[in-house]
Amino acid sequence: MKLKREYDELIKADAVKEIAKELGSRPLEVALPEKYIARHEEKFNMACEHILEKDPSLFPILKNNEFTLYLKETQVPNTLEDYFIRLASTILSQQISGQAAESIKARVVSLYGGAFPDYKILFEDFKDPAKCAEIAKCGLSKRKMIYLESLAVYFTEKYKDIEKLFGQKDNDEEVIESLVTNVKGIGPWSAKMFLISGLKRMDVFAPEDLGIARGFSKYLSDKPELEKELMRERKVVKKSKIKHKKYNWKIYDDDIMEKCSETFSPYRSVFMFILWRLASTNTDAMMKAEENFVKS
């Protein structure tokens, strides 16, 4: 607890220095506009309050654009079928562009009369070679056909367990383990993204994500004292999973990123969105990517 308080104090101290540098003698205002608060759901507003209390310098990133995932107007009850479609979309989008993934998904929807097939239908259709051939013609590789079938089997055979698993709280690791163990093609990163966008879990952090790593590098670039402290207090080194290519930004190891992110717990999912925004150099592209992430 003592060490965590020290990290919190360093983050806030570095933030105050940076804000003072930018604002000079102008008063600091970190209260989000009432209209902004009214449009977002309560748990997101609570997250913002917590994050800004820890680091006021993040105010502009939060204030400048709404967060689609947490808008009240986007909140709808999710069914087991919704979760299946979201995970199926994750599989379809792997290793290809967003536009290509949308095109493949649209062809699957067209094949099934205007709606993405539910898991029970796909479970039966994967037993029929002729139907499998039709699905594959939509643009799915052999590997993605295997992955999609695995997902359909998982939901069909374990739907009661899944309903219970997804309906519980504070079981993020259990959800990740179940998905990674039972569904071919779903790894830890994909499972974490589902926790955020599908189950709306608020305390997820993925240091293995390239955008998060880049945003974190920018975040720490003006916090020298915090960086020194994080480096000094390392106990267990967890190497970054990101290959060290010739990036023009510093890649930090996972343990450094995770330790720093703990300051923003239990709202690290929102901190991830902030880091994604810090990583982006194109606001319009960033907002479009967020919208696609919410829909996928």
UniProtKB/Swiss-Prot annotation:
According to its UniProt record, the EC number is 3.2.2.21
Q: Name one GO molecular function term.
A: DNA-7-methylguanine glycosylase activity
Indicate where this protein resides in the cell. Answer: Nucleus
Catalyses:
Hydrolysis of alkylated DNA, releasing 3-methyladenine, 3-methylguanine, 7-methylguanine and 7-methyladenine
Would you say which domain of life the source belongs to?
Eukaryota
Q: Which family is this sequence assigned to?
A: Belongs to the alkylbase DNA glycosidase AlkA family.
Coiled coil residues, start to end: none
Q: Point out the gene that encodes the protein.
A: MAG1
Which residues are catalytic?
A: D209
One Pfam family per UniProt: HhH-GPD
- PANTHER family assigned: DNA-3-METHYLADENINE GLYCOSYLASE
Q: Which residues are modified to Phosphoserine?
A: S110
PROSITE patterns according to UniProt = ALKYLBASE_DNA_GLYCOS
Please report the name of this protein according to its UniProt entry. DNA-3-methyladenine glycosylase
Q: Which UniProt keywords apply?
A: DNA damage, DNA repair, Hydrolase, Nucleus, Phosphoprotein
Lineage, uppermost ranks:
Eukaryota, Fungi, Dikarya, Ascomycota, Saccharomycotina
Tell me a GO cellular component.
nucleus
Q: What does this protein do?
A: Hydrolysis of the deoxyribose N-glycosidic bond to excise 3-methyladenine or 7-methyladenine from the damaged DNA polymer formed by alkylation lesions.
In this chain, the site described as Determinant for substrate specificity and/or activity is at W189
GO biological process annotation, one example: DNA alkylation repair
